[in-house]
């Protein structure tokens, strides 16, 4: 009889451990599935950008007017703000701010969020950085789709294209049949003026960081520190867009459209995709004052009961 009890206890322990192991395996599989779905969505969001940047899709071939002064600017060598500086500043500044902000919230304020990732630091960074990168992919895909679909000529197009005007009859007005003598890669790039990628990317990254600071920067010691930081970020984006006009890379309307697109994507990502401004449930504070209970004598209880019965 004793051996049977020992056998039953051992079998119960093995069954319990086996159930816990199976549950852990299912949770691990679910985590990998959710991460895979997120990565797949991120890939789809950035797919148009990846395809267009590899020159798999050529921009629309637009004609021009011989006397169009807006595309006769000289081509400048280099950019005031290069693509590398723009990408590094926009991505690194925002991600570094998110890492510092989320780590501070978890370590000092004990504020976390529920997620399928167990570690609170990894969970917070996975959500916030992932949402930000997803918005980057959306913004850049929108920008490149507009560039190749519209095919607007940059202000320095004629200087880069170098068409042979001896074979062009300018009296016809709009010239659609022409051949460029400049380098093909530069000519194709000169057809991507609308809208400004520098303006849209800088506005998205800086404005998203502005929204992040508005949600997470809760220190009230210096009332003007947060708005000063936010306006500085917006001014950095503003200067980046204006530099594209002075570099003869974009028309002013291209920059304005880029600003609007970047701001719209940043707003949608911050308010509808991330949890930065979602309402959080408040815990009810427990009252420290003890509740006073009225002690009723048994005679009064019987009298009240009889009164209820008669009623």
Residue ranges and their predicted role:
Residues 123-127, 131, 138, 164-311:
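Membrane-embedded catalytic cores of phosphoryl/pyrophosphoryl-handling enzymes
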